[in-house]
Amino acid sequence: DAHKNYVDTQIERASLWVDSFFVDSEYEAEDAYSQIRLRPEFYYRKEQGAKGKFRFRARVNLPNLGRKVSLVAGADDDSGFDDSVDDSADEGIVGLQFFGKQTSKWNTSFTAGVKFNDFAFFLGPRVRYKDTLGEKGSYRFTQTVRWQTNNYWQFNTRLDLNRLISDRFYFRQTFDGRWRGEKSEDEGYRTRVSSFLTHRLSDLSGFQYEFSTIFHTEPDTHVDRYVVAARYRRQTKHKWLYYEIVPQISWDEEYDYKFNPGIRLRLEFFYGRSTSREFWKGEAEDTDEFRW
């Protein structure tokens, strides 16, 4: 079976564990099972001081539709980069995601809903393609397009290059670019280039080391921020509770690239079905059969 042979490759099994355990937004966007995530967070950065944040994200599979339609609500993952490198304000949304073609390599969907910050309706497609590069390499390309009723467009383009180093170490190089019409004159094409080294300690814990550069192209091209971070994530004895400790150092253009140490503490409450899918689509990180 072509699906099983692809998913059973060592690099794909490692990618599934990394994406599911560390809750990669692109991985989560492809899951049609019902789930709720609650994330109280605390941030401290030397130049900005301390602040708290509460993130809510829900996905409800609509019954009798064969996992083809989901209601999504809460923080919009497409509004900014990951929190470890981008602390922009969350944008709340409510919408419906309609799933199209889904294979081991292809995933397509179409989402329509409303953004509350701008109070605008939006709609647009999402397409993902991934494949292996030899026995220990793979890539994933994702393109999302949105049109809003305030006549703004949004384009998100992401490329992941993955490499399995050993049974415990996994490397990913990410290029993530975002163009938003409402911010086009101030930011242009905002881009994050990140290197991630994941160290799998056990089935329940892991480190993710990161170096990221964020830059934009308007009104001129320059770097907004450099970030070095070490993210420790662990599942507790309760399968529905995770915690994270993320010390980091950044050099921000806003503060003249001064040395800016900080830390992020997060609890995550997870309710609902696991982010796993059938074997040909993926396996859960907490199944007995899942191994790199």
Stretch-by-stretch model annotation:
Residues 1-20, 264-292:
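Flexible, glycine-rich linker and terminal segments associated
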Residues 1-104, 114-122:
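Outer-membrane beta-barrel initiation region
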Residues 64-194, 199-213, 217-226, 235-241, ...:
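Outer-membrane pore/translocation modules
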